[in-house]
């Protein structure tokens, strides 16, 4: 019997109906490789293998061994590459699509890693509902939402109750999808025009991410007050105020009220 490890944030999805909904939610992959983070008990992995070749990253050696045992009992061959590695260091040479029931405690980091990886062309992932809502809200209420919509098209799909897992978490989970959008990627890469496209895209995303950390450092304070405290941007405060004037926005505007962060950041970086 496999016992979930709290240290790895393990909650195994066991409800067949939700497993099937996840597989059905996958968009056409075309020539993209399918990458899974976390093999768990292998239930989702086996359903995916019924349709696609698959590479799975799993840090827990006991779960890897359990998956190998399950595969031996299957009546048909499956095309699975089981990488016994930490997914925080996921690196692929070819374009791929990511799917996962992510561990709560590192879910945000893994999603952001996928956003900034040019080889990742999209993701279908489950996180704590609160985290999913932060990524999927359509306005600029938080930095995660701005980052998600800056890189692709974002869709909140469905909620998953605690009863669908073993052991049951204390909160609801949600499944959401992000499909990378080439025009949005081009806009991000244009922030750093001196590099190759993939390098510029990654660096552009990281530049926006760092800028947003400064902008949203104290969400209830004004944007200008937050940037005054930033080592990187406090010297650009006059340009921020110039931008707000050009956009007919008051100097008292908060970070959540900025409509176009890429436009603001480009303005600050030029000249």
From Swiss-Prot:
Signal peptide: none
Location within or outside the cell: Cytoplasm
Positions annotated to bind S-adenosyl-L-methionine: 11, 13, 38, 58, 86, 101
EC number: 2.1.1.182
SUPFAM superfamilies: S-adenosyl-L-methionine-dependent methyltransferases
Catalysed conversion reaction: adenosine(1518)/adenosine(1519) in 16S rRNA + 4 S-adenosyl-L-methionine = N(6)-dimethyladenosine(1518)/N(6)-dimethyladenosine(1519) in 16S rRNA + 4 S-adenosyl-L-homocysteine + 4 H(+)
Enzyme class: transferase
Keyword terms: Cytoplasm, Methyltransferase, RNA-binding, rRNA processing, S-adenosyl-L-methionine, Transferase
Function: Specifically dimethylates two adjacent adenosines (A1518 and A1519) in the loop of a conserved hairpin near the 3'-end of 16S rRNA in the 30S particle. May play a critical role in biogenesis of 30S subunits.
Family of this protein: Belongs to the class I-like SAM-binding methyltransferase superfamily. rRNA adenine N(6)-methyltransferase family. RsmA subfamily.
Name of the protein in question: Ribosomal RNA small subunit methyltransferase A
Gene this protein is translated from: rsmA
